Regions:
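Extreme N-terminal starter segment of soluble prokaryotic enzymes
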Residues: 7-12
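Pre-active-site segment of Zn-dependent metallo-hydrolases
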Residues: 17-22, 29-67, 71-88, 92-98, ...
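A short acidic-Thr-Gly-centered motif at the start of a beta-strand
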Residues: 3-4, 25-27
Length: 115
């Protein structure tokens, strides 16, 4: 588990590292822990099944979740946060906030159909 607070800032790529979809990055500093994006993996059925495997990062200790923009590969798994024990605020622009309900509904439909 990546729940320790580091002595200096660390960045851990949890998705979209060497690939395009599934954006998720953990930023840890001595002052807090922030997840940047929590997106869907898309492509093959095997890729999409990866959406069911969530990294063990101590979700209940996350201080904030930042959504960079309203594409499912960046925000498609935001709806999982309460189930993971994460009650951190989700921070984004107003335009992204306005689009999130529609994007998350679409994300849920994609997951139900394909996985």
């Amino acid at each position: 588990m990546l729940g320790r607070v580091p002595a200096k800032a660390t960045i851990t790529l949890l998705g979209a590292a060497g690939e395009v979809t599934g954006s998720c990055t953990l930023l840890q500093t001595p002052r807090g822990r922030v997840v940047i994006d929590f997106g869907l993996f898309q492509g093959s059925v095997a890729d999409e099944r990866r959406n069911l495997v969530v990294p063990d990062i101590g979700w209940s200790t996350i201080d904030a979740v930042v959504v960079t923009h309203a594409h499912v590969d960046h925000c498609g798994r935001i709806g999982m946060l309460p189930r993971l024990g994460c009650d951190a605020p989700v921070l984004c622009t107003k335009i992204t906030a306005d689009l999130l309900p529609r994007v998350l509904k679409s994300s849920a439909n994609l997951q139900a159909i394909r996985v």
